[in-house]
Amino acid sequence: MASLLKAFIDPKKNFLARMHMKAISTRLRRYGLRYDDLYDQYYSMDIKEAMNRLPREVVDARNQRLKRAMDLSMKHEYLPKDLQAVQTPFRGYLQDMLALVERESKEREALGALPLYQRTLP
């Protein structure tokens, strides 16, 4: 069952997945975003922790891309075609760190320790 699901969502094997990936890529390129920019740090504490561990330059570049995308959206415009061509929407920067943080939190849970970011009142 798992192999069937992996084959179904793999863009190399499934035409619909390939079309979906192309549509997502086009929409992200219009605003100059990357797929990892769509993660909300207020949604999950793991994402927030992964963002805190990233280098400052990466976080600043992410914030700049998000501000530019919001500005373009407010103006009902897209990036110029020459800038859209150089965008890399699926070049990830957060996935590796997020996987590390999730692995650490699962390990802490297995050991019976409290998560690093769980707040408790004295």
Curated annotation (Swiss-Prot):
It is found in: Mitochondrion inner membrane. The lineage of its organism: Eukaryota, Viridiplantae, Streptophyta, Embryophyta, Tracheophyta. It holds the Pfam family UCR_14kD. GO terms for cellular component: mitochondrial inner membrane; mitochondrion; plant-type vacuole; plasma membrane; respiratory chain complex III. InterPro entries: QCR7 (IPR003197), QCR7_sf (IPR036544). Transmembrane segments: none annotated. It is a peripheral membrane protein. It comes from the Eukaryota. It comes from Arabidopsis thaliana (Mouse-ear cress). Component of the ubiquinol-cytochrome c oxidoreductase, a multisubunit transmembrane complex that is part of the mitochondrial electron transport chain which drives oxidative phosphorylation. Component of the ubiquinol-cytochrome c oxidoreductase (cytochrome b-c1 complex, complex III, CIII), a multisubunit enzyme composed of 10 subunits. The complex is composed of 3 respiratory subunits cytochrome b (MT-CYB), cytochrome c1 (CYC1-1 or CYC1-2) and Rieske protein (UCR1-1 or UCR1-2), 2 core protein subunits MPPalpha1 (or MPPalpha2) and MPPB, and 5 low-molecular weight protein subunits QCR7-1 (or QCR7-2), UCRQ-1 (or UCRQ-2), QCR9, UCRY and probably QCR6-1 (or QCR6-2). This is Cytochrome b-c1 complex subunit 7-1, mitochondrial. Its main location: mitochondrion. GO terms for biological process: mitochondrial electron transport, ubiquinol to cytochrome c.
